From Swiss-Prot:
The protein's name in its UniProt record: 2,3-bisphosphoglycerate-independent phosphoglycerate mutase
Annotated Gene Ontology cellular component terms: cytosol
Catalytic function, reaction form: (2R)-2-phosphoglycerate = (2R)-3-phosphoglycerate
GO molecular function, one term: manganese ion binding
Protein's job: Catalyzes the interconversion of 2-phosphoglycerate and 3-phosphoglycerate.
Co-factor binding details: Binds 2 manganese ions per subunit.
Family membership noted in the UniProt record: Belongs to the BPG-independent phosphoglycerate mutase family.
Matching NCBIfam families: pgm_bpd_ind, PRK05434.1-5
The protein's required cofactors: Mn(2+)
PANTHER family: 2,3-BISPHOSPHOGLYCERATE-INDEPENDENT PHOSPHOGLYCERATE MUTASE
Length: 515
């Protein structure tokens, strides 16, 4: 057997959806001679990346975490959002032992119950329906001091869409006759994932000390003041919500804190700030010794606090199956999507499999990626091309974040530039794969950059879409594309192209049939 391997490369263009209409479509309007040529000349198909096809509620847009879990699992994986919706509908949520024990302990000790999370109907990191259920659970179990610390979205939802959510919760607390919204802050600060500790510190001080740059009598007034300062939801500066005569809602020893985000990647940093004894991201002026800190789902295996909904383990994901067959694999991306091609792709497993190498390219340190739409794609491509040529790997899995990260800024011109940058990168990847007689699949995890304006509101469209994504084959086999596929069909497709057995746990089907 030759020691030089001919790799199968999976290139995931994050946020690169397929939409026929040209209006506000940064992908269709960009100059993409390489992708155009591949689409015309190579076997290709469109695959579903949203809703029930990826284990989300019907019609729910896809996202990167969900996309990569399905890509790696080779079966539809029912997501936390769907699981939690069902728990609430069936009533089981209200008897969850972890949540009820934390609330009961705080009530018994006369302490407050703090609930924090992304107050959004976006369904990507959280859902406000779950937060509402948590408020109801706390109230039903006798909590009177119930404080909601609302992180505002504007990224997976329109840029200025928080007001109805804040009104809904203000009315809910009024109806209960207990509890209130205690603070609002944009997710840019509270949910950073790129070690920008100066941002996280502003959120931490707001939550622990009720200390913010701004104060308002109620949440809607606080939000409107932020809009007047030209801050969209995502960027709302720390605002304490406290009417005259109300006690402050700072977090104190013995209080319960329940973090209602279900997606891990943007929940980890702020969680570590609260719970790590050796935390050194910044100097914490106040360290709170909570009665309980509960994470809704497991944000990381090394965060040692209680978890209301631990992960269900996935057997025989693509990466694990490769390991069992002594195959070598490489995962490579920038900071922004590194967790996706490793942790999420491996079904929530943090440790690399035997034979799995990883390369992390630092994303550029800019405030928002419209300022540098090419991101770190040149360095990423250089490393990827080198890995393809090395002969070391049977499989290489790469994610280019540009379409998604620049799409999220809502800046159309920057998104076009991002897409044109990707086209140049793909040209180099195709050449590298062909030079070693390897195989290449090009796809996406969900859409974004193909819809840069919301036709209903006229606002910039910063969220993902529920549109299909492309799947293109470039390689040395004569193959025929199958229609009607979805993300969970990609792992079986790859195994089939490698002429490997498909494990029974993978219920997806190959989308390229060798002729």
């Amino acid at each position: 057997m030759s020691s030089t391997k001919k790799p199968l490369v999976l290139t995931i263009l994050d946020g690169y959806g397929h939409r026929e209409e040209q209006q506000d479509n940064a992908i269709l309007n960009a100059k993409t001679p390489v992708m155009d040529r591949l689409w015309q000349q190579q076997p290709h198909t469109l695959i579903a990346a949203s809703g029930l096809d990826v284990g989300l509620p019907d019609g729910q847009m896809g996202n990167s975490e969900v996309g990569h879990v399905n890509l790696g699992a080779g079966r539809i994986v029912y997501q936390d959002l769907t699981r939690l919706d069902k728990e609430i509908k069936d009533g089981d949520f209200f008897t969850n032992p972890t949540l009820t024990a934390a609330v009961d302990k705080a009530v018994k000790a006369g302490k407050a119950v703090h609930i924090m999370g992304l107050l959004s109907a976006g369904g990507v990191h959280s859902h406000e329906d779950h937060i509402l259920a948590m408020v109801e659970l706390a109230a039903k179990r006798g909590a009177t001091a119930i404080y909601l610390h609302a992180f505002l979205d504007g990224r997976d939802t329109p840029p200025r869409s928080a007001e109805p959510s804040l009104k809904r919760f203000t009315e809910k607390f009024a109806a209960l006759g207990k509890g209130r919204i205690a603070s609002i802050i944009g997710r840019y600060y509270a949910m950073d994932r790129d070690n920008r500790w100066d941002r996280v510190q502003l959120a931490y001080d707001l939550l622990t000390q009720a200390k913010g740059e701004f104060t308002a009598d109620n949440a809607v007034v606080g939000l409107q003041a932020a809009y007047a300062r030209n801050e969209n939801d995502e960027f709302v500066k720390p605002t304490v919500i406290q009417a005259a005569g109300e006690p402050d809602a700072a977090m104190n020893d013995g209080d319960a804190l329940i973090f209602m985000n279900f997606r891990a990647d943007r929940a980890r940093q702020i969680t570590r700030t609260f719970v790590n004894a050796d935390f050194d991201g910044f100097k914490r002026d106040k360290v709170v010794n909570f009665g309980d800190f509960i994470m809704l789902t497991e944000y990381a295996a090394d965060i040692k606090v209680a978890c209301a909904y631990p992960p269900a383990s996935l057997e025989n994901t693509f990466g694990e199956w490769l390991m069992k067959h002594d195959k070598t694999q490489l995962r490579i991306s920038e900071t922004e999507k590194y967790a996706h091609v490793t942790f999420f792709y491996n079904g929530g497993v943090e440790e690399p499999f035997k034979g799995e190498d990883r390369i992390l390219i630092n994303s550029p340190k800019v405030a928002t990626y419209d300022l540098q739409p090419e991101m770190s794609s040149a360095e990423l491509t250089e490393k990827l091309v080198g890995a393809i040529a090395s002969g070391k790997y049977d499989v290489i899995i790469c994610n280019y974040p540009n379409g998604d990260m620049v799409g999220h800024t809502g800046d159309y011109d920057a998104a076009v530039k991002a897409v044109e940058t990707l086209d140049n990168c793909i040209e180099q990847v195709v050449a590298a794969v062909q030079a070693v007689d390897g195989q290449l699949l090009i796809t996406a995890d969900h859409g974004n950059a193909e819809q840069m304006r919301d036709p209903a509101t006229g606002q910039a469209h910063t969220a993902h879409t529920s549109l299909p994504v492309p799947l293109i084959y470039v390689g040395n086999k004569e193959v025929k594309a199958v229609e009607g596929g979805k993300l969970s069909d990609i792992a079986p497709t790859m195994l089939s192209l490698m002429e490997m057995e498909i494990p029974q746990e993978m219920t997806g089907k190959p989308l390229f049939i060798v002729e």
